[in-house]
Amino acid sequence: MGREVILKSRVPKGYRHPELDGSLRVTRTKNEARLIQEARRLGVPTPVIYDIDTTDATLVMQEIKGPRVKDLLDASGPEQRAKVCEEVGRLVGLLHKGGIAHGDLTTSNMIWSEDRVWFIDFSLGSKKAELEELGVDLHLLREAFQSAHSHIMESFDIIIGSYRNSFPKAAEVLRKVKEIEDRGRYT
């Protein structure tokens, strides 16, 4: 092929009925490929999908080389962190504006390469996402920040500011985030 690729395979789960397992793995593989391609169409950097093997539930996609945003944020100074966080907020806004919820929005599922942020692993994502799913995305990202980046929580405010600037319905989603957080406190 001449290109460096990643193979992402969904392995069979022995505890599931084989027919159900095969169907679920293929459906989830196709869904992830669609979301990656749709996100790219919206202007969010994602890996190029080269092939979808529905027999083995495998994606063949572009390898994105670079540090995870999780690692980059910890190793960067304030100026670089601000640049990265502003881009993260803008890209999340683009995804949400296009109706896509990532489903596992953490700094571990973002890679810094070619001076930009790439989003990976849309396996838990959804298209035509409801307000709740968009809120869960931001809630997960905030939790990831509190867990992995508690010493730079002010950087999360940059993400939210950029998100507000790139997504007209940001205020609604942020209200939903507050509601989700409040539910978590009382359960």
What are these regions (language model features)?
Residues 1-30:
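ATP-binding glycine-rich loop module of kinase domains
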Residues 2, 74, 79, 87, ...:
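Regulatory N- and C-terminal appendages and interdomain linkers associated
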Residues 15, 25-29, 40, 44-88:
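Conserved structural core of kinase catalytic domains
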Residues 37-44, 70-108, 113, 138, ...:
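Conserved kinase catalytic-core helix
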Residues 54, 65, 107, 124, ...:
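Short, glycine/acidic-enriched loop or turn micro-motifs at the edges of active sites
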Residues 118-187:
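C-lobe/activation-segment region of protein kinase-like
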